[in-house]
């Protein structure tokens, strides 16, 4: 985090904007991974160091863990609301998937026209193997407690209601 001091001749006091850089893959592991545990002190400091007029988040991330994206984004929103400090996101090269999630926690987003932006969503891929196992007389046994626990099981025929629920 770094503070940007802006001096304007007609203002009597210095206005500061604290900057948080959220760059890299979002996840729980690795030294350079973005995650809530590693970045919570940085984010907390951005909202409490001095009396910032705003907090700027610089985002450059292809995404990653939806849970970590949610935790970081929720922390930023909570602090912004508690301290009544606006948040501005500046997208550098890419803010896709969880990276866009982080940018979307800001009050306003700025991006270069060439930046790659967007694509929050889920992709799920699999195979339909029910005919293969039937051909070889293989019986599959699945035991679950609750509804929709084996949704889109590759060893059963696809159900439209499962597809609709996933979308």
Role assignments for model-derived ranges:
Residues 1-85, 94-101, 105-167:
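Small-residue-centered hinge/linker elements
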């Amino acid at each position: 985090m770094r503070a940007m001091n802006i001096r304007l001749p007609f203002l009597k006091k210095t206005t500061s904007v604290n900057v948080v850089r959220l760059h890299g893959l979002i996840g729980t592991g690795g030294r350079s991974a973005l995650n809530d545990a590693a970045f919570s002190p940085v984010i907390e400091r951005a909202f409490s160091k001095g009396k910032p007029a705003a907090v700027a988040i610089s985002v450059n991330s292809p995404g990653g863990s939806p849970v970590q994206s949610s935790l970081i984004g929720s922390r930023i929103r909570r602090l912004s609301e508690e301290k009544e400090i606006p948040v501005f996101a500046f997208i550098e090269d890419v803010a896709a998937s969880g990276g866009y999630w982080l940018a979307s926690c800001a009050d306003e987003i700025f991006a270069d026209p060439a930046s790659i932006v967007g694509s929050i969503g889920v992709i799920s891929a699999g195979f339909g193997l029910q005919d293969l196992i039937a051909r070889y007389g293989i019986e599959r046994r699945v035991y679950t407690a609750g509804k929709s626990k084996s949704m889109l099981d590759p060893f059963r025929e696809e159900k439209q209601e499962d597809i609709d629920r996933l979308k």
